[in-house]
């Protein structure tokens, strides 16, 4: 865990630069930032970024910086142009495996900060922006790995050679608005809400992304507003693509039928040739939560398996049973007990 400690913040003068310090801390792998002067506007700005773009970053202003720095149980780093070269100490700090607090000053830093710090670290001994210094330190600390981390938020930016490619993971109300836009019935709404409740309960027992599971569960049957057959998953995925919904949610919707449909079987069923077997934990959770409901009525695994076998779908019944067993193992509890 890395925390950033911003001191000597002057709300009416430093708001923009401290905002950038916080944004850099979040984007480059820190888990929180503490600011000495109380600044509610700054807190609101950063919290809004976290809400929209994801992550678990935390901000708190109005802290006693000396107490926070002195009492920190880990390695205390002070970034300063007068310190030891970054390249001489970063490996030692990283390999300690301890939590790190990085002090980043605004105006002149009190000498007491130098005395409390375990490491006074210099990114360069030339004048440099504290934003740049923090970014370089974090990048060296994580050895560039932080650039490969992916945040999951309402707004997700995808790389593109030109222009802007942004896709959305809607919150619960956004999902319901989308369903109503396409004319979802009360029956359908009640069904997806029931599936969502179970899916989220399962997800909380795993490392699954709750936002993806919530959106995928609520939108999994949006295709049923247009068609009622097995193609509703593909139709629903197409609707979401047109609506600019995140690809990971689209994939959950596209792969939620039973415990999945393999490409050879898909062609026989009249679906576009593709593999519709759930692969991510989020896809598996939503698919099986849907299996365990008929409308808003909860079913046990045996009821689901028996229903499939009565229709002559022995292979599908077996896949559902295997998925049930797998997820039960993951959460350490029989899915029927949730």
From Swiss-Prot:
It is an enzyme of class 2 (transferase). Its EC number is 2.1.1.206. Homodimer. It catalyses: cytidine(56) in tRNA + S-adenosyl-L-methionine = 2'-O-methylcytidine(56) in tRNA + S-adenosyl-L-homocysteine + H(+). Residues 188-295 form the HD domain. HAMAP family: tRNA_methyltr_aTrm56. CDD domains: aTrm56-like, HDc. Specifically catalyzes the AdoMet-dependent 2'-O-ribose methylation of cytidine at position 56 in tRNAs. This is tRNA (cytidine(56)-2'-O)-methyltransferase. The keyword Ribonucleoprotein does not apply. It is found in: Cytoplasm.
